[in-house]
Swiss-Prot record:
Ranges where the record places region FAD-dependent cmnm(5)s(2)U34 oxidoreductase: 268-665
Name of encoding gene: mnmC
Function, as annotated: Catalyzes the last two steps in the biosynthesis of 5-methylaminomethyl-2-thiouridine (mnm(5)s(2)U) at the wobble position (U34) in tRNA. Catalyzes the FAD-dependent demodification of cmnm(5)s(2)U34 to nm(5)s(2)U34, followed by the transfer of a methyl group from S-adenosyl-L-methionine to nm(5)s(2)U34, to form mnm(5)s(2)U34.
MF GO annotations: flavin adenine dinucleotide binding; oxidoreductase activity, acting on the CH-NH group of donors; tRNA (5-methylaminomethyl-2-thiouridylate)(34)-methyltransferase activity
Family matches, as InterPro entries: FAD-dep_OxRdtase, FAD/NAD-bd_sf, MnmC-like_methylTransf, SAM-dependent_MTases_sf, tRNA_MAMT_biosynth_bifunc_MnmC, tRNA_MNMC2, tRNA_S-uridine_synth_MnmC_C
Any Pfam family matching the protein: Methyltransf_30
Family as reported in the entry's similarity comment: In the N-terminal section; belongs to the methyltransferase superfamily. tRNA (mnm(5)s(2)U34)-methyltransferase family.
Keywords from the UniProt entry: Cytoplasm, FAD, Flavoprotein, Methyltransferase, Multifunctional enzyme, Oxidoreductase, S-adenosyl-L-methionine, Transferase, tRNA processing
Superkingdom: Bacteria
UniProt name for this protein: tRNA 5-methylaminomethyl-2-thiouridine biosynthesis bifunctional protein MnmC
Species of the source: Aeromonas salmonicida (strain A449)
Localization in the cell: Cytoplasm
Cofactor(s) named in the record: FAD
GO BP terms in the entry: methylation; tRNA wobble uridine modification
Reaction(s) the record says it catalyses: 5-aminomethyl-2-thiouridine(34) in tRNA + S-adenosyl-L-methionine = 5-methylaminomethyl-2-thiouridine(34) in tRNA + S-adenosyl-L-homocysteine + H(+)
Amino acid sequence: MSQTSLHHARLDWNEAGTPVSSDFGDVYFSNDNGLSETRYVFLQQNGLPARFSHHNSDSFVIGETGFGTGLNFLATMKAFLEQAPQTGNGARLHFISFEKFPLTRDDLHKALTAWPELAPFSQALIAQWPLPVPGCHRLHFAGGRIRLDLWLGDIKEMLPQVPHGEQGLVDTWYLDGFAPAKNPEMWTQDLFDGLARLARPGATLSTFTSAGFVRRGLIAAGFAMKKVKGHGSKWAMLAGERVDKKPQRTIVPWYARPAGRDGEVVIIGGGIASAMTALSLVERGRKVTLLCEDHELATGASGNRQGALYPLLNGEHDALSRFYSLAFGYARQRLLSLAKHHPIAFDLCGVVQLGYDDKSTAKLAKMQQGPFPHALMRPLTPVEAEHECGLPSGHAGVSYPLGGWLCPADLTRAAIKEAQASGLLQVEYDCPVTAIHEQVDGWLVASREGRQWQAPNLVVAAGHQLPALSPFAELPLYPVRGQVSHVPTTATLSQLKTVLCYDGYLTPAHNAEHCIGASYGRNQSTQAFSAEEQAQNQARLQACLPDQAWPAEVDVSSNEARVGVRCASRDHLPVAGPIARLAGLADHYARLQRDQQNPAPLPLHPGLYVLGALGSRGLCSAPLCGELIASEICGDPLPLATDLLEALHPARYWIRKLLKGKPLN
């Protein structure tokens, strides 16, 4: 996928107050009541909102080719909430849209003031409006009943990356955008073919244009199209539906992510990963039982007082960087939403990362070559770094202005309380799981005390204890011990305004104490206090800032600290998804290196999922990974591009070897 930076739309405003694209010379919506045109062209011609009432699956999926001001989405959301059934688990709306030139937040606000009847929905959109970072940004509305996947970037690149199975994904297409004469690069046969590929059998489509080449192109792609009366004074427009659906998919069989079984889900875990997964599942109406090993939540790696929240980026903007740039935005969204109703200690005060030696300086310099807006990451001179964080370092660095710190345990508890409010989540404490057993129609989970639970679906989010449970022992994961020191603030240390990252990190004061850490003990899982690591936490700060006096005020002598054990992977990415049957996998894919045309699907343990290896970035990655697992189980659209799904797939370690013709060992 392209690493090109995104640019905000450049707007003019005409006499009617309508936004006009400076680059394309076209209006974003009709001067003559654009909302009325939206309702006629896209809702009425697609049989909406009536189809919402009798849709035969939990989630109705709409795709749109040009998000613009979001008018189509907002009008659809209003109609859905007015029409869709409220009984049972409730129908859900999933809206997928693409935008190459997103509006600024201020321009979006100005444009949407034209529609006061949509104000509550507009405000929710503006509050979550993402940064111009390429990829899929998932936003939640109406308590999770409505999800918007906003794919920022060129639709020619993004559309082939939308994951879907053989029978498509989309129930209705809104073919919108600037007029074909104004933006001919978008209106191509490749686009029409892509819409057909993602369309489910019988999916409908409508568009404001009646251009002959558009009609012919859609027919060639597999739609039955007709001209109908246009809106208002417009003579005609196009409407139709998908016919002659041929099985096509974007997820290759060896990275399969089939939907889970209907019914309940059991989750093993008690930290941020399991909490976020549970929340995303109950938002979809699933009953969940969470099995927590301890007598309370977040006693493991999720139990630190303060954890830094910022993205892991690099100049190549590879899969790692792309995933974390999107996960960061989603984590912020989840945090701010939960903090409205639950007590969470946090401060999005920013994060400053220093180039403290030649290697780290070169790494930051290369990172600045990536396609990142300054609102996500911007370079700092030594003077700017001091001004930003409040204390001198003598080093240049970068700022993550939207980052900060939060209490992981508070976030974990908030997610669980929010999920419990639905009445669909039951938490069982003091349940150390010792074995899981596959059954014909689900999974049996057994605890040390002999208690048992059964469910069609099982998610294991047990942190560094994952390898202790079969069939997870073969995953190439490892434990990482980390000790965080708690130090009292001083008059000088209290001037620290942001999280400061170097060869370690130091948080601003909270309750008159700072957190400094953390030690890194690979393949170590002991949790006893270490005086040596306590001293090392302070020594690393002094070593990185040798010319500064204030690090000497960091006093670790009280031996106040907390030890946690994280679970990590070799490639620093989480494992999130279904679990493959390793026995016979090499024989199953013996010819995969040479023949990738008709391979059999990946042999999986049905209904079994894993979420782990979050490492030291769990605050950033857990919310999006939990949403991914829930989407997968429920058969919903997935919130990441296909190549990122491959990068997170638990089977990636073995599939990569098989694709290279290497033996599995």
